[in-house]
Amino acid sequence: MPKRGGRKSHPKKDKGGGGGGSNFGRFKTNKNKKKTGMGSSKNHGTPRSTNIDIPELMDLDDNVYIPEIDTKVSQSSMKNLSRRPGRRHLYEEVGYTDKHIEDTLRQPLRNRPIEFVKAKQVYDPSADLFKKLGKSGIPKVHQDLLDSMNSPPSQEAHVPESPILDILSEESEDDAIDEVVAHLASSNTSLDSDLVGRGEISKTNDEGESDDVEEEIEEEVEDENESEHNEHRGIESQTESEQDEQDEQDEQDEAEEVEEEEEEAFIIDDTGDAEILKDHNPVKPQTSLLIQSKLPKSSTQNDIDNIGGGLDYDPVLNIGKVSLQTKRDENGQSTTELMSVNQLNKISTKGFIDEKKMLPNMEKNVSDISDDDFGGYKDYIAQVMRDGKLEVDSDEYESETNFDIMASSSDNDDDDEDNDEGEKDPSEIEYGFLPEDYEFDVSQVSISNVRFGINNQLYTKCAELTGSDDQFLWIDEDDLVDYVLSKGVREHRLNSFMKFITKGLIDEEAIEVPNYSDVYISETSEDEEEGANSEDENLAAMIAFTKSQQQSFMDLDIPSTERLKTKGKGKKKQLDLDRMQLDIDMRESLQDQYQVHRQAKRSKKQRREDARYEGGIAKHDLLVKYPYSLHIKDICYEFETFLHDTSRDSMNFPPLDPHGNKTVIKISNFYNMKSLKCGTGLKSFVKVSKNRKTFHYLPRYDQIGNVSRQRPIFNRIDQKRPKDEITRSDGNSKKDRSRGRNKSESSAQSREGDIVGASAPEIGTNNIGRKLLEKLGWSKGEGLGAHGNKGISEPVVAKIKKSKTGLK
């Protein structure tokens, strides 16, 4: 028999017994509630059940609101709305704000986007004003007048036939009538003033009509008041009603007459004033009508002088750039004669006109005629052809006639120059006038001096080239050109850019105007022919000399232009002047100049390296800061600096050997940072970046100390250390070995058969060993040993043996 409660029908349900066992799990006690709330069940995250009693929906009224029971946070809550999409933590918010501060907080107002929102309704205060006036009780007569004034001028004004007052309310009739009267009086004056301002109603009509309208309105108001009072009192009679009807009929007839008069006074002008249009649109007469080609009758000079009143007469009339020959008639009027069609035909076939023969008194050439005068001249010629009924097609005549002879050569030259300026090469345009000139920030480069030579140099201040923002250094022009081209300066704008940054430093070439004071100008053509003949003779002589030249070009004694050779290495390097025949002073001077040049070149290279090193330190570039090797203390220092630097999110270490990269990765883990190995081969390096754990936990300095006590030096694998660096850090091993051999060697030289130690001195009496032997009974010349058993008194002699012939 299975045990009771041993089988479970639903393993996911609460504990407290199986489905077929005890009934302890059926009831929800406090203990069971705690178990379900601990999160052990798989339904963790679902909303917890509540004990709120929900009434039946049928028992509620229609206007009762039932709130939703949900423990989830609404998506539209303030907490969710404060979060940006994709960033749920404060560190991510801070990083996002820091990265986009240039585009948000520091962005100038003129560069921020502007949003235009279209209004839902049209704002028209005048339309609202007219609506309010219409509701306030304006008579229909004036309302129609206002509508006609606001309508377009093409529509004719329509005046209603019957003016009837609109009563505002029935409760307060007396007050309403008084308000209507006051309003009508003010509206009449305003409307009449508007009409007079527009020029549509005369002053006389305004005065008469306004008085009539006011009287009629007052009479109507009085009659209405009387009728209303009679209605309230209940005193009405048949005779009075008939009389009132008769009065109303008379008033209507009078109102119709007033309306007819207003219609006659109100006129819309659709045609306009002809005189004003004539002044604004003058009709230009034809040029041919203004020019008369008929000659006046001849008159005597005395009559002309008498008519002129003694005034000076100039026969040449200058109009702009045109000079005309004039004549005066007997009436004192000046006339001129223009060329006929035949004369123009002769000009088109024979060429330009000889002005000196035709008009000797003219000061200017006919070629100075302007374009406007030339156009008028063509109109005149066309008029002459129409009047003369020439059997020549106008198109053919215009094509055959050379009208361009009137244009001056100077004007053509000016036009050519203007065209040349309009089609100027973009490279010649001043820098800063094209859109592509703003791709590079010119303020990054500053030049204060220029030095020309074999390699042009510029005294430049540039942080990326010199490594300093305040220091000027001499930089080759080629290096500067490569830099600006890489930063965005277009190649076709390079010349304009160089002229712009060196403006004021290079003297512009002054254009010399030749005065030909030293040049002989011949008055006849014979001298010119003689000069041409002499040039031909010189050219022939040069050709004959080259043909008769027997010696080749290589045999000519031309000094060489190759560089001087050097000899020696290192500090002993100097010029090789042995093959040159120079005196001693000249040799020493050349050698000194060469050494000064080498020292300047060496110091310049060192300054560049120092500037590059300082720039790398400022930008936290470890490749520049550690060119050859890193110490374990340097690695720990860089990690500590990177941890407290809020402006950097990542740091790249130089390429190290595999053990060095593992050491860097191990230290990054101790600092709670993320490490990534990048690159392959000799270019493999470790990239370290910060993450969330970096700010939540402290570094494990005990583990970092253990690593720092291991391998101390880590060399870069992408750079080879030079000999100077090895000697400065590790010492010169070759010299150290040579020094050790020199210390062990002796200056004495041995020969074949020499006795070893023959010249050695005797052991002194102060020697400790000799003192002990003397106390034991030893004396000088005796052998060592006890009595009866003493050794030899003479020591064994050792001789030097160098040869290999055997013993002798």
Curated annotation (Swiss-Prot):
Residue span, R3H domain: 629-692
Compositional bias (Basic and acidic residues): 195-206, 717-735
GO molecular function: nucleic acid binding
Pfam family name, one: G-patch
GO cellular component, one term: cytoplasm
Residue ranges annotated for the G-patch domain, each copy included: 765-808
Region (Disordered): 1-55, 143-311, 393-428, 593-612, 709-763, 783-808
Polar residues bias: start-end ranges: 43-52, 284-304
Basic residues compositional bias, start-end: 1-13, 799-808
GO terms, biological process: mRNA processing; RNA splicing
Similarity field: Belongs to the SQS1 family.
Function of the molecule: May be involved in splicing.
Protein name: Protein SQS1
Organism name: Debaryomyces hansenii (strain ATCC 36239 / CBS 767 / BCRC 21394 / JCM 1990 / NBRC 0083 / IGC 2968) (Yeast)
